[in-house]
């Protein structure tokens, strides 16, 4: 086993009705533009979309939607989200859904403020950036994890981005 340091300053809110109870008060900690990221239509059919949009609108947030995140999202999909976040000066990414949405948004969070392709960065020796867009996951029936796994060109990008900005593959 290699020596390492793990620091986790993450708050996790649990419970039925947690989105309604906690999301509104947490939004005040971030700027005005929120990227609402989700997969298919299940969040609309279930009513989650309307609840979340109601909370965002009540908080006076400008919402940029990033939808159709598929199961096992592609790296290209994450890059599309990063471009959208960058162009709209997103202050917070709100990922609503399961593990695929969460994984995609972790890459978006890291890539949006970079000039260099994060995929290429894993093959170079350098100091990784520490400026990420804050990410809030509203996970539905999925465990939370700080690791993001992406199928890619010829390999898999396994991003483990911690507050210190370190990534492992």
Task: Give the label of every model feature segment.
Residues 9, 30-32, 61, 87-91, ...:
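Short coil/turn connectors at secondary-structure junctions
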